[in-house]
Amino acid sequence: MILGVDLGARRVGVAVADRETRFARPVEVIDVSHADPVDRIAALARDLGAGLIVVGTPLTLAGERGPAAATQTEFVARLRAATTAAVEEYDERLTTVVAERSLRAAGASAATRRRVRDAVAAQVMLQGYLDAADRER
Protein backbone atom coordinates (compact mmCIF):
# COMPACT_ATOMS: atom_id res chain seq x y z
CA MET A 1 0.00 0.00 0.00
CA ILE A 2 0.98 3.59 -0.63
CA LEU A 3 -0.34 6.55 1.37
CA GLY A 4 -0.71 10.04 -0.06
CA VAL A 5 -0.76 13.06 2.24
CA ASP A 6 -2.02 16.57 1.48
CA LEU A 7 -0.79 18.79 4.30
CA GLY A 8 -2.88 21.78 5.31
CA ALA A 9 -2.81 24.23 8.20
CA ARG A 10 -6.08 22.96 9.69
CA ARG A 11 -6.69 19.65 7.96
CA VAL A 12 -4.52 16.92 6.49
CA GLY A 13 -5.97 14.78 3.73
CA VAL A 14 -4.97 11.14 3.37
CA ALA A 15 -5.42 8.85 0.38
CA VAL A 16 -4.35 5.28 -0.27
CA ALA A 17 -3.43 3.23 -3.31
CA ASP A 18 -2.70 -0.43 -3.77
CA ARG A 19 0.67 -1.06 -5.44
CA GLU A 20 -0.97 -3.46 -7.93
CA THR A 21 -4.09 -1.56 -9.01
CA ARG A 22 -2.32 1.83 -8.79
CA PHE A 23 -5.64 3.56 -8.25
CA ALA A 24 -5.76 6.17 -5.47
CA ARG A 25 -8.80 6.73 -3.28
CA PRO A 26 -9.46 9.15 -0.40
CA VAL A 27 -9.28 7.67 3.09
CA GLU A 28 -9.72 10.36 5.71
CA VAL A 29 -9.21 13.94 6.78
CA ILE A 30 -7.28 14.57 9.97
CA ASP A 31 -8.29 17.67 11.93
CA VAL A 32 -4.98 18.95 13.32
CA SER A 33 -6.75 20.53 16.31
CA HIS A 34 -7.88 17.05 17.44
CA ALA A 35 -4.98 14.78 16.51
CA ASP A 36 -1.29 14.94 15.65
CA PRO A 37 -1.26 14.13 11.94
CA VAL A 38 2.20 12.55 12.15
CA ASP A 39 1.01 10.06 14.78
CA ARG A 40 -2.18 9.28 12.86
CA ILE A 41 -0.41 8.82 9.52
CA ALA A 42 2.26 6.62 11.10
CA ALA A 43 -0.53 4.50 12.64
CA LEU A 44 -2.35 4.29 9.30
CA ALA A 45 0.85 3.25 7.54
CA ARG A 46 1.43 0.53 10.12
CA ASP A 47 -2.20 -0.68 10.12
CA LEU A 48 -2.47 -0.74 6.31
CA GLY A 49 1.01 -2.13 5.75
CA ALA A 50 2.07 0.88 3.69
CA GLY A 51 5.67 0.77 2.58
CA LEU A 52 5.60 4.25 1.09
CA ILE A 53 4.11 7.59 2.11
CA VAL A 54 4.01 10.35 -0.51
CA VAL A 55 3.71 13.85 0.96
CA GLY A 56 2.62 16.73 -1.23
CA THR A 57 5.17 19.51 -1.68
CA PRO A 58 3.71 23.02 -1.89
CA LEU A 59 5.28 24.47 -5.02
CA THR A 60 4.42 27.77 -6.66
CA LEU A 61 3.15 27.81 -10.24
CA ALA A 62 6.76 28.59 -11.23
CA GLY A 63 7.86 25.30 -9.62
CA GLU A 64 9.61 26.84 -6.62
CA ARG A 65 9.00 25.89 -2.99
CA GLY A 66 6.09 27.97 -1.73
CA PRO A 67 5.50 29.75 1.59
CA ALA A 68 4.22 26.56 3.26
CA ALA A 69 7.40 24.65 2.37
CA ALA A 70 9.07 25.17 5.76
CA THR A 71 6.10 23.60 7.56
CA GLN A 72 6.06 20.73 5.06
CA THR A 73 9.82 20.13 5.48
CA GLU A 74 9.43 19.90 9.26
CA PHE A 75 6.40 17.60 8.85
CA VAL A 76 8.33 15.26 6.53
CA ALA A 77 11.24 15.08 8.98
CA ARG A 78 8.89 14.22 11.86
CA LEU A 79 7.07 11.63 9.72
CA ARG A 80 10.34 9.95 8.70
CA ALA A 81 11.27 9.65 12.38
CA ALA A 82 7.85 8.20 13.29
CA THR A 83 7.51 5.45 10.69
CA THR A 84 9.49 2.70 9.02
CA ALA A 85 7.79 3.42 5.69
CA ALA A 86 9.74 5.31 3.06
CA VAL A 87 8.64 8.95 2.76
CA GLU A 88 8.84 10.76 -0.57
CA GLU A 89 7.76 14.23 -1.62
CA TYR A 90 5.74 15.06 -4.74
CA ASP A 91 4.40 18.23 -6.36
CA GLU A 92 0.93 19.08 -5.07
CA ARG A 93 0.32 22.18 -7.22
CA LEU A 94 -3.38 22.81 -7.84
CA THR A 95 -4.56 19.57 -6.21
CA THR A 96 -6.99 21.38 -3.92
CA VAL A 97 -8.37 23.32 -6.90
CA VAL A 98 -8.87 20.08 -8.86
CA ALA A 99 -10.48 18.43 -5.83
CA GLU A 100 -12.88 21.35 -5.31
CA ARG A 101 -13.85 21.42 -8.99
CA SER A 102 -14.43 17.66 -9.04
CA LEU A 103 -16.61 17.81 -5.95
CA ARG A 104 -18.63 20.72 -7.35
CA ALA A 105 -19.08 18.88 -10.65
CA ALA A 106 -20.33 15.86 -8.70
CA GLY A 107 -22.93 18.05 -7.00
CA ALA A 108 -21.45 17.80 -3.52
CA SER A 109 -22.88 20.25 -1.00
CA ALA A 110 -20.67 22.92 0.56
CA ALA A 111 -20.60 20.95 3.82
CA THR A 112 -19.57 17.74 2.04
CA ARG A 113 -16.91 19.57 0.04
CA ARG A 114 -15.45 21.04 3.23
CA ARG A 115 -15.48 17.63 4.93
CA VAL A 116 -13.75 15.64 2.14
CA ARG A 117 -11.84 18.18 0.02
CA ASP A 118 -8.45 17.54 1.64
CA ALA A 119 -8.71 13.75 1.26
CA VAL A 120 -9.72 14.18 -2.39
CA ALA A 121 -6.76 16.55 -2.87
CA ALA A 122 -4.51 13.82 -1.42
CA GLN A 123 -6.10 11.37 -3.87
CA VAL A 124 -5.39 13.72 -6.81
CA MET A 125 -1.77 14.18 -5.70
CA LEU A 126 -1.20 10.46 -5.13
CA GLN A 127 -2.75 9.53 -8.47
CA GLY A 128 -0.46 12.08 -10.15
CA TYR A 129 2.53 10.47 -8.43
CA LEU A 130 1.46 6.99 -9.56
CA ASP A 131 0.81 8.11 -13.13
CA ALA A 132 4.20 9.86 -13.32
CA ALA A 133 5.94 6.75 -11.97
CA ASP A 134 4.17 4.61 -14.60
CA ARG A 135 5.32 6.96 -17.39
CA GLU A 136 8.92 6.67 -16.19
CA ARG A 137 8.90 2.87 -16.54
Predicted segments, located by residue:
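Phosphate- and other anionic-substrate recognition elements at nucleic-acid/protein interfaces
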Residues: 1-5, 9-137
